[in-house]
Amino acid sequence: MSGPNPNKQPVELNRTSLYWGLLCIFVLAILFSSYFFN
């Protein structure tokens, strides 16, 4: 899991966390919309 470039790890982690945040917001938006529409 450890890469040869320690400088590249934080960028990858930041990008992954950003994608996870967007995904969570997207799922929450769908859940809230379906809850309100029901």
From Swiss-Prot:
Pfam assignment, any one: PsbL
Membrane-protein topology: Single-pass membrane protein
Locations listed in the record: Plastid, Chloroplast thylakoid membrane
InterPro entries, alphabetized: PSII_PsbL, PSII_PsbL_sf
Highest taxon, organism lineage: Eukaryota
Gene Ontology biological-process entries: photosynthesis
Transmembrane segments: 17-37
GO cellular component labels: chloroplast thylakoid membrane; photosystem II reaction center
Keywords: Chloroplast, Membrane, Photosynthesis, Photosystem II, Plastid, Reaction center, Thylakoid, Transmembrane, Transmembrane helix
Similarity field: Belongs to the PsbL family.
Function field: One of the components of the core complex of photosystem II (PSII). PSII is a light-driven water:plastoquinone oxidoreductase that uses light energy to abstract electrons from H(2)O, generating O(2) and a proton gradient subsequently used for ATP formation. It consists of a core antenna complex that captures photons, and an electron transfer chain that converts photonic excitation into a charge separation. This subunit is found at the monomer-monomer interface and is required for correct PSII assembly and/or dimerization.
Summary of subunit composition and partner proteins: PSII is composed of 1 copy each of membrane proteins PsbA, PsbB, PsbC, PsbD, PsbE, PsbF, PsbH, PsbI, PsbJ, PsbK, PsbL, PsbM, PsbT, PsbX, PsbY, PsbZ, Psb30/Ycf12, at least 3 peripheral proteins of the oxygen-evolving complex and a large number of cofactors. It forms dimeric complexes.
Designated name of the protein: Photosystem II reaction center protein L
Source organism (scientific name): Cyanidioschyzon merolae (strain NIES-3377 / 10D)
Source lineage: Eukaryota, Rhodophyta, Bangiophyceae, Cyanidiales, Cyanidiaceae
Name of encoding gene: psbL
